[in-house]
């Protein structure tokens, strides 16, 4: 009776080590996207004075000359929220193995990088994370293109 509860070895999906490594990297990248998107709420909180620190004017920033209570600073504060949902959508697409996740990740990262550059010193870690994401996206695109062209060549050889 207990044998029926245990899965049979031949019924389990057989996946190679490459598949598991690729899935682990995808999950880790998705977690990075989610974490970086959540951190963007700090930028929003700081610009509206909700964070308990004056990170808007701490260190070297390109927006230090702006009025902290002015409409420009508040518009930039709202802009800090934009990458959050973009990163969440990108992470969902990545985990679900959809083809569109790269575009969402790229859009989120470009907006994030622009905001982090405006707050250069307080957001230095964000710049490093954004550059890491951009490099990762570039590597992914190159590897995916090579894989697709290898697959196409191999299928052409089989049809000859």
Where are each of the predicted segments found?
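Membrane-interface extramembranous regions
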Residues: 2-160
């Amino acid at each position: 009776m207990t044998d029926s509860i245990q899965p049979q070895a031949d019924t389990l999906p057989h996946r190679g080590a490459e598949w598991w490594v690729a899935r682990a990297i995808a999950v880790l990248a998705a977690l990075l996207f989610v974490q970086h998107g959540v951190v963007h709420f700090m930028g929003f909180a700081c610009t509206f004075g909700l964070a308990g620190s004056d990170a808007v004017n701490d260190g070297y920033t390109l927006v230090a000359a702006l009025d902290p209570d002015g409409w420009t600073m508040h518009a930039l504060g709202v802009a800090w929220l934009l990458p959050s949902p973009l990163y969440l959508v990108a992470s969902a697409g990545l985990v679900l193995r959809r083809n569109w996740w790269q575009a969402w990740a790229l859009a989120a990262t470009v907006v994030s990088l622009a905001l982090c550059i405006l707050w250069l010193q307080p957001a230095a870690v964000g710049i490093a994370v954004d550059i890491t994401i951009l490099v990762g996206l570039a590597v992914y695109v190159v590897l995916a293109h090579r894989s697709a062209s290898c697959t196409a060549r191999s299928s052409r050889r089989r049809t000859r």
